[in-house]
Amino acid sequence: MSEAIAIAAELRDGSGKGAARATRRAGKVPGVIYGDKKAAICIQMDPRVVWAQISKTGFFTQLFNVDLGKDGKHLCLARDVQMHPVTDQPIHVDFMRVSADHAIHVKVPVHFTNELKSPGIKKGGVLNVELHEIEITCSPNDIPHEILIDLDGLEIGASIHLSDLKLPAGAKPYHVASGATVASIAAPTVARAETTETEAAG
């Protein structure tokens, strides 16, 4: 969780693919701000400003104050970034307005810690990740950049369920059952193969 980052932008004329191409030819990255029951507005940004943000971890869980100068500021979350297939540079950004007074749905990445302290992994166990991100409902001010899962002490066969996780205060899973498996530590591939062969022989 962190404070909103200010990001400079300008209004741009027109909408649609033609207007977006014209914006890119002028050396800017086109974008749009929508949501919060207000009309969508078309914007343009310096590509260096965009790249400086998308290269950071947690871009899609970071709050932004999109600053349009005399045209006002908009509290937003980035919802989508289109990248050029050859140059891998940003060519369009979608921002969604949010209100501090209303809960939102957001997908938060899952990261794991203390893998080397897991007896199961030390024995050759394999960490199988079922959910790489979890969608939650929470206040915009309480969005976590990541959900950390501690693997310390976990043996082969251990499973981590959504109900085991500590979410931020006020946050709830969205459209995911509390009993859903987030990750598990499976036996080494060789061991599983030997077990299968033994069962087949028996």
Curated annotation (Swiss-Prot):
Keywords: Ribonucleoprotein, Ribosomal protein, RNA-binding, rRNA-binding. This is one of the proteins that binds to the 5S RNA in the ribosome where it forms part of the central protuberance. InterPro entries: Rbsml_bL25/Gln-tRNA_synth_N, Ribosomal_bL25/Gln-tRNA_synth, Ribosomal_bL25_b-dom, Ribosomal_bL25_C, Ribosomal_bL25_long, Ribosomal_L25_dom, Ribosomal_uL5_bac-type. One of its GO terms (cellular component) is cytosolic large ribosomal subunit. GO terms for molecular function: 5S rRNA binding; structural constituent of ribosome. GO terms for biological process: translation. The keyword rRNA-binding applies. It comes from Paramagnetospirillum magneticum (strain ATCC 700264 / AMB-1) (Magnetospirillum magneticum). Part of the 50S ribosomal subunit; part of the 5S rRNA/L5/L18/L25 subcomplex. Contacts the 5S rRNA. Binds to the 5S rRNA independently of L5 and L18. PANTHER family: RIBOSOMAL PROTEIN L25/GLN-TRNA SYNTHETASE, ANTI-CODON-BINDING DOMAIN-CONTAINING PROTEIN, RIBOSOMAL PROTEIN L25_GLN-TRNA SYNTHETASE, ANTI-CODON-BINDING DOMAIN-CONTAINING PROTEIN. HAMAP family: Ribosomal_bL25_CTC (MF_01334). It comes from the Bacteria. The keyword Cytoplasm does not apply. This is Large ribosomal subunit protein bL25. Belongs to the bacterial ribosomal protein bL25 family. CTC subfamily.
